[in-house]
């Protein structure tokens, strides 16, 4: 693997532990949620633009899932841990998403105001469910070579902007205040940082097979989230063009991870 794929240069954090470094990069990835929310609340972004940006972010995340998580897990521990992790992550997200959908969080990422009839608590939990697997992936990436994977952080950052942009627009149309919406995403950012730290802290001394299962678990959850929310929303707003834009996002992340 090339140097860039192995990781980002560590920030100057003095004697701060690697766990705090993981939290820092989790915060960086999650901070994009605040950026997207501000854009969605301040500017009237055309739905087609939101759809295209979501498609690009989906392509970036698919690449990170394939090469930064799944491939590395397979290289270190073989096929069985990858299959178990992918299946477990996908099933966990599916069940959690299904439960939240039936308690008022079904349209939490939509931009058309469908959240009006939703349960605010379920919407918050749904946002956390979407963000935690990505953040855990950031923390776990630190376990490979001691530096966080640039493609993982970039993928999470680029995908989070359109996610929160779309959701913030919809939540505002549904009648939620700007303060409530920004508070929601701020909470998700904090939890994202904690999840990234936990991803490293809980697995720092774990055997390679455990790390591989965790990588694949995060990959399965993220992939299921993409297919369930981001990709359908992108297609709804931007039509068949999203296929090309998704491919471009995949290519961009692939080249970034192999630079």
Predicted regions and their residues:
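Intrinsically disordered, metal-sensing/regulatory segments
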Residues: 2-259
């Amino acid at each position: 693997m090339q140097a860039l794929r192995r990781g980002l240069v560590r920030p100057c954090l003095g004697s701060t532990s690697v766990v705090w470094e993981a939290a820092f990069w989790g915060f960086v990835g999650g901070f994009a949620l605040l950026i997207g929310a501000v854009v969605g609340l301040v500017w009237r972004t055309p739905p087609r633009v939101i759809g295209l940006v979501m498609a690009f972010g989906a392509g970036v995340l698919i690449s990170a899932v394939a090469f930064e998580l799944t491939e590395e897990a397979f290289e270190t521990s073989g096929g069985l841990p990858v299959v178990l992790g992918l299946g477990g992550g996908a099933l966990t997200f599916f069940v959690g998403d299904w439960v939240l959908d039936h308690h008022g969080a079904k349209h939490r990422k939509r931009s058309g105001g469908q959240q009006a009839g939703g349960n605010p608590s379920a919407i918050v939990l749904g946002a956390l469910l979407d963000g935690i697997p990505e953040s855990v992936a950031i923390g776990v990436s630190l376990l490979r070579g001691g530096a966080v994977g640039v493609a993982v952080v970039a993928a999470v950052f680029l995908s989070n902007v359109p996610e929160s942009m779309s959701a913030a627009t919809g939540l505002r149309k549904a009648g939620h205040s700007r303060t409530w919406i920004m508070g929601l995403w701020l909470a998700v950012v904090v939890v994202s940082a904690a999840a990234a730290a936990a991803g490293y802290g809980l697995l720092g001394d774990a055997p390679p097979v455990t790390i591989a299962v965790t990588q694949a678990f995060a990959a399965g959850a993220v992939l299921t989230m993409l297919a369930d929310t981001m990709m359908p929303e992108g297609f709804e707003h931007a039509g068949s063009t999203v296929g090309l834009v998704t491919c471009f996002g995949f290519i961009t992340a692939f080249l970034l991870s192999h630079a």
